[in-house]
């Protein structure tokens, strides 16, 4: 197990959570508030946005725990799978009519988290 790679993956996830939750959240909610969406739809959109932030935090925390306590290695596999699946979702949606997603960092950061995490485990 390469602890440094797991810690790098955790750092990417934590940095992504901070940027996504704070900076991205302000930009996103500004755009949502200026839209014609119903208040309930705006609220649900905010929950959806911040659930991804929570996923990034949980990813970082889990990978950091595994780096510090290798016996917890099994905890990392669902996190790594979630990051791979998220990256694939970004790519698929980006290629099927939502091209702006390809330009966003989410796909690349999730893929980097998964690759570094996997490499750190094997």
Regions found by a protein language model. Name each.
Residues 3, 74-78, 98-109:
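Non-cytosolic membrane-interface motifs at loop->transmembrane helix junctions
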Residues 4-7, 30, 34, 111-115, ...:
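Polytopic alpha-helical membrane-helix bundles and their juxtamembrane interface segments
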Residues 11, 15, 19-27, 40-68, ...:
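Core segments of alpha-helical transmembrane spans in multipass integral membrane proteins
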Residues 28-29, 100:
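Juxtamembrane/interfacial segments flanking transmembrane helices
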Residues 33-41:
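Perimembrane loop-to-helix junctions flanking transmembrane segments
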Residues 52, 76-90, 108-114:
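Hydrophobic alpha-helical membrane segments
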Residues 69-70, 88-104, 117-122:
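Membrane-helix boundary connector in multi-pass membrane proteins
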């Amino acid at each position: 197990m390469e602890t440094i790679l797991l810690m790098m993956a955790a750092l990417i996830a934590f940095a992504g959570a901070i940027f996504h939750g704070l900076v991205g959240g302000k930009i996103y909610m500004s755009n949502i508030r200026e839209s014609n969406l119903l208040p309930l739809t705006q609220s649900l959109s905010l929950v959806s946005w911040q659930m991804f932030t929570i996923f990034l935090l949980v990813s970082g925390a889990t990978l950091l725990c595994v780096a510090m306590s290798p016996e917890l290695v099994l905890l990392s596999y669902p996190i790594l799978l979630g990051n791979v699946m998220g990256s694939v979702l970004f790519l698929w949606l980006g290629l099927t009519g939502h091209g702006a997603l390809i330009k966003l960092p989410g796909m690349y950061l999730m893929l980097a988290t998964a690759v570094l995490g996997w490499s750190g485990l094997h």
